[in-house]
């Protein structure tokens, strides 16, 4: 059990008034502000699911079990850093419009000088408020509003890892996006987080500044951006035979190639997220047949094939529920292949409460440039219509499994199905 998190000394170290608001930065950097305001960085504290998870699950859990308080306070080290550094814990709810609502603001990133942990984890940033702001670029002119100092640390993935790696009180890596990057091909090639999430483009950095051809845009687009998710994985499906008779067996093979992410997919809040492969055949008369994935036989595979299972029983602790049986684990059609890594509580039940995670299950996510191959063995029904049979493979993605979202009354957009990709093939059914 890890009872001390890396940055406990940050708690209450500063005051709200030590930091500028993002709106003040907007007066000189309007474009950058608008980019940031559309990204999850600006909503890390105010986003509806984060608010529900924190105030309905995390805070009540820490009241039931005081051991959890340090970790639950620590959520704010990355979701509401100004509140954490101001010692206002838990912070006021978003509706109260406190400085906690600044979320991950301009100041939070541009006052960071280095990491205090290796690997970086749990808000391990060294930060000092003041007139000096740090940039990855050597300034050509100085701002009248503040001093600019170049700092290469802002260009590293370790900078991002301060918050995109997380270890819970039990020593479990419950978020490891930067570590996944480091272990993969993008890390070995030096293709940083910034290349995908802060791409370079021609842009005017400040109203009184020059236009650069290679400015880092502050888009921060990720899992909540359907346009970013779309196309992450390439799909191809093919049959083993093209002509088949009713009653005959056809094997469809699907290749899923991660051609877009430098980390695993899904990543981040992995306890919440699923991607799943759904294969459906439609015969010449429009009859539809759902195909179930072939089992491979690896340990923990049962968590990667959708079915009728209850999970997330530990929500009963913060919600103070008696005889709570849990909710459906997956909430999708049975027999689909799921790309996920399950998180388990002390009782061995799956959990979406990362602070309560005691162990991790099989990691069946898709790594960077990895190709997963899945097979679907389909015995054609005798009543299948002769003619062309179309077969569609689609990879879907959900930020939060729908049964949990419905149970906690999370706004529907958090469990909306995002289509990652699809591919079609066909066979001919003989009379």
Residue ranges of model-derived segments:
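An acidic-aromatic substrate-binding cleft motif
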Residues: 18-22
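Exposed beta-strand face motif in extracellular beta-rich ectodomains
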Residues: 387-391
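Hydrophobic alpha-helical transmembrane segments
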Residues: 68-79
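Conserved, well-structured interaction surfaces
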Residues: 77, 81-88
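Primarily the internal scaffold of c-type cytochrome electron-transfer domains
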Residues: 1-16, 32-67, 87-358, 362-368, ...
